[in-house]
Amino acid sequence: MYKVFAFLKRNTELLTHDEYRAGHVGYHCCHSRRLKGIRGYLVNIWSNASLQQQLGPLYDEITRNEPAGFLDLWDGFPQVYFDDWQSWSEAATAEPNRATAEGLAIDPDWRLDDGPYLFDVIEGTEGEFRSHHLHMEEHRILPVERGEQKATKLMQFFRRNPAIPADAFQSAVLGRYAYLNARLNGLQGYTVNFRDADQEAAMRGFFADTAWGFSAAGRAHRQAFCDLWDGAGELFFNSVADFAVARTDPELNLELSALERHLFDAVWYVEVDENVIVMPNRDPAPAFYYR
């Protein structure tokens, strides 16, 4: 599948972090979930609870070179799934999905015009806002099991040790390192994502060629963000406490820590509140409209 992370900063002049959360999940998603051909749609908002305070000394033990002010760079990131790049590039095409007196019709009210008020608007543009839409190469290590209780989702951001070639790095992360993480007690799902080296892969076709993201300023903005990390793991537990217990297993922690020192130039965690807007469906698409 074609998977995109879209990191977004709120409009700080209008909204607090919690107001942004309400505006994104409460209203914006009502429109964006109708993107043509969407196969999955999750919105991750960084949690108000400090993960460092919850984990205590363990946090410092399992993190290294966390970028200062990382959470100041974004408030949330949707992750969307499409069958392929072509489907993603055509996602903003309107479809007839509103019942009217004349039958099914294209909804004239379907628009995403709240963007400049919700997100970090770029002055001097016609409502454009700063974003990092990035294609992610997904590797499902352990399928996510979502119960009725809201799961705890931890994002593990990492940056490659520059002494290790990219191919060897990915093989090592997906090999012994992923195997050990998958053995963490209480783990309910684990996915490893590597950021596409082509930083504009998810932008081409979806955004106009004249979009700010293709300008020198837009490219520099994206490059600075991408320099911080090369990939991210998604780990699911019942609670942060369960993760702490699992990660302090003496045998696992010893080898995981050794591998992290070898593989990663930087590694750190962010707890996010995951909102499931469209449940990811990797099976062949049915021949009818569904969400």
Predicted regions and their residues:
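Macromolecular interaction modules
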Residues: 1-291
